[in-house]
């Protein structure tokens, strides 16, 4: 089945921009076929549902093994898991949410996940994003819904290196990837 699945970015990524010293100033990659589940849940909010941790603090991420849960709103989360995990996760979460008003949806094909890493990753994002991405304000484990180059994205900082994951609608992924590559060009010169 894998040979029938395609990404809109398969001919663009991975991509890296070397600085004058030869080390990558910024690199772009794609997390292909990551499973994504949307969860809407009415209060009271549990700390876990179906064994999946729910961050209750705004704009935070909870991690348990390979499952990441991003807080998107007071009653909304995005759960990501490795390829093939959705049927089991959907079952667990749906069963756990059966006694409360909830919506559990497989969103796996709706967004592409672009990974941005390297010493200039933050500077690249700051070119098109109005969020304060300074390390005091946006740290590993932070996430936010925002605009990047005018497109709605979900931004998830995964490490202090820094590295980020950008969740973008599948239909806009190629345009955003082209924008990122073009915007990164200035970082070819070390400085």
Q: How would you name each of these model-derived features?
A:
Residues 1-191:
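Basic, glycine/lysine-rich polyanion-binding surfaces/domains
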């Amino acid at each position: 089945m894998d040979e029938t699945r395609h990404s809109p970015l398969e001919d663009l990524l991975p991509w890296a921009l070397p600085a004058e010293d030869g080390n990558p100033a910024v690199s772009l990659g794609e997390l292909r076929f990551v499973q994504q589940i949307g969860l809407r849940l009415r209060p009271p909010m549990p700390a876990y549902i179906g064994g999946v941790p729910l961050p209750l603090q705004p704009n935070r991420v909870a991690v348990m093994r390979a499952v990441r849960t991003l807080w998107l709103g007071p009653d909304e989360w995005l759960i990501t898991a490795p390829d093939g995990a959705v049927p089991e996760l959907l079952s667990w979460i749906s069963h756990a949410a059966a006694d409360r008003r909830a919506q559990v949806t497989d969103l796996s094909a709706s967004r592409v996940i672009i990974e941005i890493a390297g010493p200039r990753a933050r500077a690249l994002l700051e070119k098109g994003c109005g969020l304060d991405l300074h390390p005091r304000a946006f740290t590993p484990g932070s996430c936010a819904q925002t605009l990047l180059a005018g497109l709605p994205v979900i931004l998830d900082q995964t490490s202090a290196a820094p590295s980020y994951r950008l969740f973008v609608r599948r239909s806009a992924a190629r345009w955003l990837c082209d924008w990122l590559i073009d915007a990164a060009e200035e970082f070819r010169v070390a400085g």
